[in-house]
Structures are given as C-alpha cells and as structure tokens.
C-alpha cells in the first residue's frame, strides 16, 4: 500500500515539474555575468543573451539602450575607446563597436582554445582568462582582425585577469593566483604564484596589494610589492561565496554570491573587516565601482546600482534592472 502511494507521489511530482518546465521553456532568465562602466553606459555580459548596453544616467530609472547577440555565452566584458571586448565562452573573444551605444555592431572575433571567462585590455592587447587554456594574449591593433600572439598555460582554470605594472594577475580557480610578466606581451613569463587559496574567481590590484575573491574562502589580500615573491598578508571569510571584487576609496566591494554585496574596510589589509552588507534580488557575480556609485551584475537580475554614502557605506536599497529586455 505504502509502495503504491510513494509511486503515485513521485509521478505527481514529476508531472508538476514537466508542467513548470513547459510553462517556462520560452523565458529568458535575467542574468548578468559581468559589468563594466564606460561613459554613460554600463555594459553587461548577459550570458547566452549576449551583451547589453544600459543607460545609467538616471540610476532610479535604468534603461536598456541596446543589446547584441554574441556567438557564445558572454561571461566577461571590458570597454575601452569605441569598443567593448567580450569574453564569450566557447566563442572566444568578440569585439563590439560601441561608438553609438544605442546601435552596437560586431567588428571582429577570434576563437580561443578554452572557455573565455574574463578579459582585460591594455595598450594594443587583450588578455583573456581562458579557463583550462590559461591566459591568452591577443593583439587588437586591428579590431577587425584580432589574433592570438602568445599564451601561458596555468595550473588551474583562469577565471579573470587584472594588469598592473607590467604584470598580469590571473585568478586561476584551484590554481590560486598566478603572476605573469607581460613587459613583452608576445613573450609572457610566469614569475610567481600563490597556490594556498580556495578557488580564486576574481582579482583586483590597488597600490601594493592584490585582492582576490576566493569563493568559499572569502577574500585574500596579497602583498605584491615584489611580484616575484608575493605574500598573503590577510584573509577574511565572507558569509557567501566571493565571486567579484572592486576597491572604492578605503573599501573593497565584494560580490558575494547569494549573500549580495559585502563592504570590507581594507585600510589595514592584514586585518580586514566587514563594515556593511547589502541585499540583492539574486546572486551577485561581478561588481564595478566608479566615482560615487557601485554597479553589480548577477543572476536573477541583470544590473544593480548602489550610491556610496560618506565614502564608508552604500544606500540601503539599490536600483535594479531585472528585465534586461524591456
């Protein structure tokens, strides 16, 4: 008797699941993988939905200015000059013309051997964090014909990359933080690494320190005054899983997954402390700071904007653009 009841219950649950799946099959879930602010627009890497340009002149009334579908899954974005550079998953690097943000156009692309997740542009080069394929160095001198000119294999999966003083700092997942000399971009050389991390997802450099978002490990502060001999000088567990970091004034804003945004005082990197936390409608993935505002991208919403108050805290409630296609 009990066996029949359980069988009927399982069938009912399965049937309800099929109904829900059918009802939601055509929906495009709002997802922001990464965000970069350039001029009066925030450019949001929207996964399988491509790249979005959002007008941010009125944070209380965020408006999608345009979008463009990319060949893969847009996971990272960096904007410079008249172009947005998109780390497009299995489709490598996509270059989008944004001279007119309301009418973006595809300009060029180059496939990469891995899964492009993050991108950083400096001079005539784009550095792509290419997951299992490590760091790819791409010449963008001719945006219509980008080409790979060098690569460095890393021990983990490269998620994101930052550049400071002729060095690239790669958040390399289980491989920790990898430091690569790029004085000669076509001849990059590994110089050091910090492997004693949990799962490095993102990195940002400010002054003499690299701050690493280390997923369940929280935040690590690394002294990089001598890039060939980096040292962990501080660590702080966050309540969620740290995915993205961005320094602003004496603070570090952390995209902390299901726990929204965490605000960390980094005036003393060896004794960091959480000074604020802010709710978001979904899981945060990436954060960008500019002047008096913080921009956050995540799943369950596309883009959120918080105002900075007194250089020490954010307004309690941010403004969110949940429906990126409206």
What are the language-model segments listed below?
Residues 2-10:
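Bacterial N-terminal signal peptides that target proteins for export
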Residues 14-326:
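Feature marking well-ordered beta-strand scaffolds used for ligand recognition
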